[in-house]
């Protein structure tokens, strides 16, 4: 059954098959491509002025880069990260060395700022494409993925609610990987 027959229509768009450029077994690229481009029609987002600099090729390229980084730098230490928790000695936190290497590759890729505007140092990547990228990292190593994902979430809060002074101070360093971020929430009714 072809994608076209599953949709009940003929698709004459040229197709740059995502599964050809992704050499990862973390996520079924054929299914991901079907969801992104046939079900959710993510390519139509490029018709909006905010995303007009992108096309399917750039979307596929960012996803393929994510798959490669996840496969090469996150997946190999998945079990090791689970069995070697971060240690706090009262002054600093120590993780296994592979976490730092994975962090460096993730931050150098630009993915920490991917969903943000160009003016803020981002790629203006649509949320659906960024989520597809994130899925590779979560599949490869949920433990280590927490570091960039919490940083990205903290940066989103700063970008949405902080003063311009704080944005200028923290966002560039978070986006290029010099700073990391977290969210600490308390639940007073359960003893935290």
Label each PLM-derived region with a short phrase.
Residues 131-135, 152-157, 183:
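Contiguous, well-ordered alpha-helical segments that form the cores/surfaces of helical PPI scaffolds
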Residues 155, 161-192:
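Phosphate/diphosphate-binding loops
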